[in-house]
Design a protein with these regions (language model features):
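Rossmann-fold dinucleotide-binding core
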Residues: 105-196
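Active-site-proximal catalytic alpha-helix in oxidoreductases
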Residues: 159-163, 170-173, 178-217, 222-240
Length: 340
């Protein structure tokens, strides 16, 4: 059983007299920066010239400087950039200013695990990964709560890397909910697997297939949307609060019987076999190589597949039904982006 670290295990005084730099001000970047600032840390923001986030960060009270200067001035540098942007930023702005004794921090292990970034041996390399999107990390913090987080140590040149990771986790609210130590390898591979087979890829494909099945059988798109997408959140919320068994306690006997007798016929051994194949591609680095080649090649297949998804009939039906529920609007894509 993994040890769970809480507030009493972390010490924010680790950051006394130090400067923390957050490179980027997107989903995780804005949340970490604001939470750390309100926890008493000295935080600066590093952004490239012309970034639209400069005005937003300054409005929030931060000193904003060019990325290279932020790295030069900081003791701890959080690379809060997309996986695809990190290598170029590292080569141009981070590496030339990454001197002995500094700490490089990530919220996802992709770049380090797959070696798209290879830091020098005389710096600490750590991971602090809240298990939730940035706007939730921020909201929970402002409400006096927190989002569970993972920490990992890749390089410990100072022999104090774990203290730094725990202090950062406390500063963003993670130790309020509980922090577990892992490795860059485990975080990266399990995160990718979850995204691809269950949380994003698996759930999206399952919802679309269910919607298509009902519509092709002559049922209205509206009914198909409610049954296969809208109600999914209600069930997942129950699972999140009380586990699968707890969710089953809250649904009807008929629903329970359909769950346990039909569910395994849909997600059967063949699905698990393909899940294992997806995991193998992650473990071997095949997925990473394909993704790096895709973004270096201009995102052609990526953009085509996203466009295809946007044109699925469930999107038009969903937009129409959600427009009838005004309380849903603040959860729209634009609403979420405005939070940054």
């Amino acid at each position: 059983m993994a040890k769970v670290y809480t507030d009493k295990d972390a010490d924010l005084s680790v950051f006394k007299g130090k400067t923390l730099a957050v490179l980027g001000f997107g989903s995780q970047g804005h949340a970490h920066a604001l939470n750390l600032k309100e926890s008493g840390a000295n935080v600066i923001i590093g952004l490239y010239e012309g970034s639209k986030s400069i005005a937003v960060a300054r409005e929030k009270g931060f000193e904003v400087v060019p990325t290279a200067e932020a790295v030069k001035r900081a003791d701890v540098i959080f690379v809060a950039l997309p996986d695809t942007k990190q290598p170029a930023c590292y080569e141009k702005d981070i590496a030339p200013n990454l001197t002995k004794g500094k700490t490089l921090l990530f919220s996802h292990g992709f770049a380090i695990h797959y070696k798209t970034i290879v830091p020098p041996k005389d710096v600490d390399v750590i991971l602090v990964a809240p298990k939730g999107p940035g706007h939730i990390v921020r909201r929970q913090f402002t409400e006096g709560k927190g989002v569970p987080a993972l920490i990992a140590i890749y390089q410990n040149a100072s022999k104090k890397a774990k203290k730094t990771a725990l202090a950062w986790a406390k500063g963003v609210g993670g130790t309020r909910a509980g922090v577990i130590e892992t490795t860059f390898k485990e975080e990266t591979e399990t995160d990718l697997f979850g995204e691809q087979t269950v949380l994003c890829g698996g759930a999206s494909a399952l919802v679309q297939a269910g919607f298509e099945t009902l519509v092709e059988a002559g049922y209205s798109p509206e009914m198909a949307y409610f049954e296969c997408l809208h109600e999914l959140k209600l069930i997942v919320d129950l699972m999140n609060e009380a586990g699968i068994a707890g969710m089953r306690f809250s649904i009807s006997e008929t629903a329970k019987w359909g769950d346990v007798s039909v569910g395994p016929k849909i997600v059967d051994a063949s699905v698990k076999k393909r899940m294992k194949a997806a995991l193998k591609d992650i473990q071997s680095g095949k997925f990473a190589k394909e993704w790096v080649a895709e973004y270096k090649g201009g995102y052609k297949k990526y953009n085509a597949l996203l466009k295809k998804g946007e044109q699925h009939p469930i999107e038009k039906t969903g937009a129409k039904l959600r427009s009838l529920m005004p309380w849903m609007q603040k959860r729209s894509i634009k609403g979420a982006q405005a939070a940054y």
